[in-house]
Amino acid sequence: LPEQSSLVLSLHRVGVKFPIKKGLLNRVKDYFVAVKPLDLSLNRAESIGIVGESGSGKTSLALAIARLIESTGNIVLLNQNLNRLTERQLRPLRKDFQMVFQDPFSSLNARMTIEQIIGEGLGLQKLSKAEISSRIDEALLKVELPIDFKQRYPHELSGGQRQRVALARALVLRPKLIILDEPTSALDRTTQRAIVKLLRQLQADYQISYLFISHDLQVVKALCQRIL
């Protein structure tokens, strides 16, 4: 067993099921099981890949771990059981785990500048304007984007650049865990390789743990020490 201090995330019998409602009264008649109960442990600076076809429940699992949908079982992040916390109790912990989605264009607000997008989560922290600006600059440099991209909008960037912005938005909060849901599937092979290389470098620099969800075994093997 890994030593307790290095354990970032552990799942115990975590499952996801959606109610099937029928009839005039819209009563629950049955459940669709999206994720069968599973156990998992993830250490600091480790990457685990979850591979499966579309519809296999991979995204449901990611959303459950991020507490964006309900699940059964125990999700323990940094010794806190997320499934036992209210949304209010969860809020200060959200900086410790971030999610990067498949399509950066739909997950980035088209009306916001890159600076506003990356800095959005910092508004909840007690930081001065200068500190926020400095953190945004640092995040842009870490994902290898020019500082002057701050004034641009998502539609002005390529797919690969938008995914780097999505990573910078996660990174700026200095999380312990990043959940990546098909983060390279909308990108060409060359851009995929560049993003995987960047993820490796960020992990080495910040000791971040990754839960990497993909149907692409080649990409998963390039990044992950373990594959489920």
What are these regions (language model features)?
Residues 25-29, 82-98, 116, 124:
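ABC ATPase NBD coupling module
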Residues 73-81:
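Conserved ABC transporter NBD signature motif
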Residues 130-148, 201:
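Conserved ABC ATPase "signature" region
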Residues 153-157, 161:
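Conserved ABC ATPase signature
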Residues 167, 195:
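Hydrophobic anchor residue at the start of the ABC signature
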Residues 172-176:
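A short, proline-enriched helix->beta-strand linker immediately N-terminal to the Walker B motif
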Residues 220-222:
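A short, surface-exposed alpha-helical micro-motif characterized by mixed small hydrophobic
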